[in-house]
Structures are given as structure tokens and as C-alpha cells.
């Protein structure tokens, strides 16, 4: 410790940016790694080539600030940038502040709600017909009217160069279903551009289901034509309408017959052959599947970033419970494929749930019944914590906390049609200083909820202040014996330990998992992992491979993988390596200043400029296509 303190003092004399000069809310980093914005971007733009063999990244940051100027615009606004006062501007004439200058320095807050999205046609102009790609024996159904190309040779001549010489899908499964359209096709194409198949490797995967919960075509048609029958939901909803206000209803659960009565009423036809379930008695509430949630690490259902490849990363690094992204119940009932894609489950997710959002008992109950008989999940979660206006103004998300009667009907209705546990995720309240969760939790316990997850912030508060763990502790005691999980500001194993010292049954990780998915490993092994840039890059490699498996290895799949990687990199860049911190651990509400990493890759990963995120994606997924545009979900940076 004494040695490191001495080196910090010495570096401070040379002219490094001192940590004590940092603004409030900025993470404290060792002096030898701190730098200025100009030096940081100059180093990134030069690809680290200006560093000699004897000169390290940290030594570069000790040069005088006046000798380094940024030669081009970084394409980033002043929003969320930390101004480091290194004294270089003292005594210089500054231009008068005008209205235009004030406008430029205006902070960009919130989300980019109307983001540009690249259409499928923009990925490749000359798209090959699926009948050719899949090497179908029969001719194209559309014949001469087909709008896609059937000329394989022409397609290959216009196709961009392969990204890598080896295809992950072919090397893993023995066959790449994308054939000639694969961006790694040379490794599995034979004569006349025919797909090569590794029969031995394919046999190893034969009969195994890797991803569950796909939308069946026949079910999609039935949903769109409104031909699906919801027998249980209709019974429950009739009871609700008859009794009117749910507060007058003692127990609005569908009346169930005893096992003896069911066997007497139903006389199923005797079947021959495989065992069927026509004569199986449905589970009663007391016989529902139970899950021991206690002392498990729960990955939060994260919109956009909580996709299946990311969940696989977290699962491999120690997550116990995973949950799909928030799905709108009305969209599911309409059979929208994009919404059903959010329910997909990888076989490695052993405790997996789906999260539903809705504002009315009829749609939520019907959706629960539909999922109960069509997909494989371990629990269903109700989103009562979503703060966005689109959901809240319709009465969903946080809005349900103020609509107790409707909330009760939704919970009891879903419970009556589900064979798996029903869980609820809530916030402390809607208004910043008005906590109402403690009033709601006893009702949730009485309504039959199996788990409550409490985010220690209100809707209005968002992330402006730290989560209120004292209040979470109070609510956990009220919820007993129902387990309550706490959520908020956990970014190290020490934070998790402090949280578990309260009355909570476990912790949910959200932003902490986005910043550092190896947080699950740190908590289980009770250590601070000073992960290297190479190890972090290997995690991105795994995400790339998982993305190609999930979204495809053709042009469209590659660009989808890139899109979600860029969204994730907007969070990953906020991680500060343990070896650079003056005080371990990093605090989630502290912004990282400009610093030089221990190598070029670590410095590149620290950049909050979207052009540098794209540079990282190009290391894994090749160059971006022409006219590529990307606007992050949050108003931090943009690339056009």
C-alpha cells in the first residue's frame, strides 16, 4: 500500500489529473491512470500505435495536456461527460457564453423514443430465395413472380466478404442452416455452392431441443382469427362481472371439484399405445408446482438487453434464476411473433420465468391460461414496476399499484389458471416521497403470490437517488412468510452481502449485471475479480456466438447480433477495472472519469463514444454495412 501511495504522489507532480480534483459523483481512480478527454480520444483514434514499447498507457496520461489536441469531432455531445479541471485553461481568454453555447451544453436526458431502425432490405439488396437457401427439392411456390433472386452464382459474386474463415454453427452442430447466405459460408460450401454436412456431429445433437417456447404456426393462425377458447378464464371473469367490485368478493377463484367428483363426471375414452394425459386430474391450488427461491441470484427481466444470448452469458457466470424480457399480454394474444420471441427459453436456463405486462384482468388472465398450456416455464411474473409513460398511462406497470381492485382481479385470475407459481415485481411507489409498497404487500400475500420482488425506488425517482434498502428490509418483514427479493444498486459482492443482512430472501441484479455480468461469480466466490480486457473480450466472443445461434449467421442475423451487442456495450463501458480504483468496490452511482487502461483494449472498452463501440463490434462481426445507423436507447451518444 505504501509503495502504491508513493507512486501516486510522484505521478501527481508530473502533471496527471489528480483524483481529488474530480467532481462529486465521479469514481476515484488511481492518479497514474487518469487522463484528459483529448488525450483519451487521441490514443483511441491512433489505435494505440503512438505508445512505444517502453511507454505504457498510464505513462501516456502523464504528458502535458497542452501538447495533445483532438483533430476531429468525436461525434458525442457534452451530455453525461465529466469535466476534469487540470488547470490547463487558467489565464486563457474564454469566449462569451451565448445562447447557442448553452444549447450545445444542454444535457440530453431520457430515451431516444423515435430511433431509426434498419429494415431487412437494407442488410442486402440482392436477397436469395429461401427455397434456394434451404436447398428444397421442390421449386419455389411463387415461380416467376418470386421477388427474391434464384441465381446463386450472381448472389455469391455480390455478397460481402466472409467475416471469418470458420462458421460457429457448422463447427458446433455439424450443419449451418443458412447455407450460402451465411457470412462464414466458405467453411461449409462445396461444389456448386452446396452445403456440406458433418453427419457425425449432427447425430450428437439429434433429438435435443436447445430452445423452447417457439410460436407454432397453427396457434398463430388461431390467435389471429380469435378461435382460441379460454374456458377457465371465462369462468373466472363471469364471477368477477357478477360480483362487481372485487373488494366485495370473498374468494373470486373458480370453484373446483374434488378428485372423486372429477373422476365420476369425466369418463375418458380408453386409449391404446403411448400414455396420454386425457385422464389426468388437473392440479389444484394446493398442489401447484413450488420453487425454493430463497438465497438464489436472480437476473432481472431487462428490456432490450435481457435477450436470450445475454441470459446465457449470465447463466454461465453464476445466475440461478432468469426471466424473459417484459412481454405485452395483448400482443401475445394477437399472435405477434416478435412478442412471442421474448418467451423463448434456452435449455441451460433451469429456473426460468416470463414477465407479463397488462392493465386489465381479462387480457392478463387469458394470456396466463394460454401460456400455461403452450409453453414451458417455471413461474410467471407480473410487471408492476415499469415506469415508462406508454405503459403507465394505460394503467399498467406502476399504475397497477394505485388500482388495487384491478390488481387483485389480475392476481387472483392468473393464479386460478396457472399450474406454476405467480410472482410480482413492484416499486416502492409512484411518487418519490410516498411509499405504498408496505400497504400492498400484505394483500399480495393473501392473494396467493409466491414471490415479491421490490425495487427500492419510486417511479418518479428513477435512478436519481440510491435505492432505499431500509424500506426494503421493512417490507421483507411484512411479507413473511412469502419470500421477498430486493433490487437496487448491487454492483459488488459486498453490496450483495449488505443486502442479504436485511430480511430479504435473495437479491435481484439488473444494472450491475449489465455493467459486469461476472458479478454473479464474484458474489458466489466472495471476491473482487480484477478481470482482464482479454477475458472481457472473450465474454463478448461468447455473446457473438450465442447471438449467431439465436438470430442467425446470415446478414440479417449478424446485424441483429451487432445491434444488441451495441446496446449492451453502452452499459459495459461504465465498468471500471478493480486494479485502477483507489477504493474498491466501484459505486453504481459514480461516473467513470477519463482514464487510460492497462492496455489498449481495456482503454477502448472504457470509451463512452458509440463509434468506439462499433469498432469493438467490427472486431467480432466484421465491418458495418453501408448506410449503417445506430442510436442508443438512452440519449448518450449517436452514430449516423
Curated annotation (Swiss-Prot):
Catalytic residues in the record: 386
Region (Disordered): 1-23, 43-123
UniProtKB keywords: Flavoprotein, FMN, Metal-binding, mRNA processing, NAD, NADP, Oxidoreductase, Repeat, tRNA processing, Zinc, Zinc-finger
SUPFAM superfamilies linked to this entry: FMN-linked oxidoreductases
Binding-site residues, FMN: 301-303, 355, 425, 455, 487-489, 510-511
EC number(s) given by UniProt: 1.3.1.89, 1.3.1.-
Pfam families from the UniProt entry: Dus, zf-CCCH_4
CC cofactor: FMN
Superkingdom field: Eukaryota
GO molecular function: flavin adenine dinucleotide binding; mRNA dihydrouridine synthase activity; RNA binding; tRNA dihydrouridine synthase activity; tRNA-dihydrouridine47 synthase activity; zinc ion binding
Purpose: Catalyzes the synthesis of dihydrouridine, a modified base, in various RNAs, such as tRNAs, mRNAs and some long non-coding RNAs (lncRNAs). Mainly modifies the uridine in position 47 (U47) in the D-loop of most cytoplasmic tRNAs. Also able to mediate the formation of dihydrouridine in some mRNAs, thereby regulating their translation.
Entry similarity comment: Belongs to the Dus family. Dus3 subfamily.
Protein name: tRNA-dihydrouridine(47) synthase [NAD(P)(+)]-like
Source lineage: Eukaryota, Metazoa, Chordata, Craniata, Vertebrata
